[in-house]
Amino acid sequence: MSVVASTSPFTLATTPSRGEVLAKYFRGLGDPTRLRILRELGADGELSAGELVRRLGLPQATVSTHLGCLRWCGFVTTRREQRSVIYRIADARVGQLVALAEALLDDNAEHVACCETIDAESA
């Protein structure tokens, strides 16, 4: 890994490998709440943060944290409509990726549900 000289707060001290960044990308999708948000947006196209809070039945702060992660990683994008922030999936391939993962899971759900290695890594 190489050292980056910039002092920007958005610059890493070292450059992660492509594999590390890809794993982080999938961890962004690896949260049940974030997947629920993406499913809701995929079904309806655009939703306000308030509507997502209502549909998910979670505290506003929790939903906002997950939306922030999804936005930062490029999974969703926003626009303002008066006082509301409206969210939508940033790229149709995100929805396709989630749909593909669900289709693959259909063939292997029992094994994935019983996987202790993934649970141990996230603890």
Model-derived segments and spans:
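Amphipathic alpha-helical dimerization/coiled-coil segments
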Residues: M1-V21, A43, D91-A123
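N-terminal helix-turn-helix DNA-binding core of bacterial DNA-binding proteins
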Residues: A13-A61, E81-V94
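A generic local structural motif
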Residues: L22, W72-C73
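Alpha-helical residues within the helix-turn-helix
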Residues: R54, R71-W72
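A short, surface-exposed loop/turn module that caps and links secondary-structure elements
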Residues: A61-V63, D119
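Residues within the DNA-recognition helix of helix-turn-helix
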Residues: H66
